[in-house]
UniProtKB/Swiss-Prot annotation:
Chain residues that bind heparin: L161, R162, K163, R164, H228, Q229, K230, L231, R232, G233, R234, V235
Taxonomic placement: Eukaryota, Metazoa, Chordata, Craniata, Vertebrata
Protein name (record): Apolipoprotein E
Gene: APOE
Species name: Lipotes vexillifer (Yangtze river dolphin)
Post-translational modification: APOE exists as multiple glycosylated and sialylated glycoforms within cells and in plasma. The extent of glycosylation and sialylation are tissue and context specific.
8 X 22 AA approximate tandem repeats: annotated span: 79-254
Subunit-level organization: Homotetramer. May interact with ABCA1; functionally associated with ABCA1 in the biogenesis of HDLs. May interact with APP/A4 amyloid-beta peptide; the interaction is extremely stable in vitro but its physiological significance is unclear. May interact with MAPT. May interact with MAP2. In the cerebrospinal fluid, interacts with secreted SORL1. Interacts with PMEL; this allows the loading of PMEL luminal fragment on ILVs to induce fibril nucleation.
Length: 316
């Protein structure tokens, strides 16, 4: 199966470099919806939003004309471009990580082809943005004059650019689909290969154990013991590798936990320092207010006592 997968990838790569008669580009109608694909990926959905926005721009309606004279359309297209290429890059890197089981040279060629297809798609979207920016400059230079010819040229350019965008998007989608299928096949093949290698060993072990139990020959027992040691060595080796991997993961988790605890300690110390600072600020104020309040209460009490003693005197 591995040979078939490698042959498929090499054939696809070679076919992309062969000189063939160019197929006629599909006619892209103004109102044509983004084709989309079954079980579409996030990058395909983002590209669909770019396509729908471009379709709206291509109507060259009064609202489009007004926003083209500002920077709104170009800014919104830039946001959609960045979102699309970000999703494409993330999906491509995910597939490259899953292609680890294939040969290093083949993997490098696959990565190169995916990057080239991604670059073509980015170039198509950049051409759209550049053409709209150019149209905006030309319209502003011809303020007060008829712009029908410019609008016609822009509409023609946008139709051609949408054809290229559709063609290169479908090319990238087909490549990613092929490589994704190969990655899934490679993962399943790795599990099957391990099962195929260990299955015969287990069966042989059972057969040898049964044979040793029925034979009294010391030579056969020694051979069985040697085979047993060999099998145990292989199992221990695989177990050691698994433990090393788990230990590495544990160390990484410990590092993360230590960093989190360190940051938590720093935040706690900062909070305590801030609390102490606040306390040092407000304690003198509170004490001063308490003293003033006590003095005020004392004065009120003294005034009330003076008033009560002077009242009887006046009665006499």
């Amino acid at each position: 199966m591995k040979v078939l997968w490698v042959a498929l990838v090499i054939t696809l790569l070679a076919g992309c470099q062969a000189e063939v008669e160019p197929e006629p580009e599909p006619e892209v109608q103004l109102g044509q919806e983004w084709p989309g694909w079954q079980d579409s990926q996030p990058w395909e959905q983002a590209l669909g939003r770019f396509w729908d926005y471009l379709r709206w721009v291509q109507t060259l309606s009064d609202q489009v004309q007004e926003e083209l004279l500002s920077t709104q359309v170009i800014q919104e297209l830039t946001v959609l471009m960045d979102e699309t290429m970000k999703e494409v890059k993330a999906y491509r890197e995910e597939l490259e990580g899953q292609l680890a089981p294939i040969a290093q040279e083949t993997q490098a060629r696959v990565s190169k082809e995916l990057q080239a297809a991604q670059a073509r798609l980015a170039s198509d979207m950049e051409d759209v943005r550049s053409r709209l920016a150019q149209y905006r400059s030309e319209v502003q230079a011809m303020m007060g004059q008829t712009t029908d010819e410019l609008r016609g040229r822009l509409a023609s350019h946008l139709r051609k650019l949408r054809k290229r965008l559709l063609r290169d998007a479908e090319d990238l989608q087909k490549r990613l689909a092929v490589y994704r299928a190969g990655a899934l096949e490679g993962s399943e093949r790795s599990v099957s290969a391990i099962r195929e290698r260990l299955g015969p060993l287990v069966e042989q072990g059972r057969a040898r154990a049964a044979t040793v139990g029925t034979l009294a020959s010391q030579t056969l027992r020694e051979r069985a013991e040697a085979w047993h040691q060999k099998l145990r060595g292989r199992v221990e080796e695989m177990g050691t590798q698994a433990r090393d991997h788990l230990e590495e993961m544990r160390e990484q988790l410990e590092e993360v936990r230590a960093k989190v605890e360190e940051q938590g300690s720093q935040m706690r110390l900062q909070a305590e320092a801030f609390q102490a600072r606040l306390k040092s600020w407000f304690e003198p104020l509170v004490e001063d207010m308490q003293r003033q309040w006590a003095g005020l209460v004392e004065k009120v009490q003294l005034a009330m006592a003076t008033s009560s003693t002077s009242a009887p005197s006046e009665n006499h």
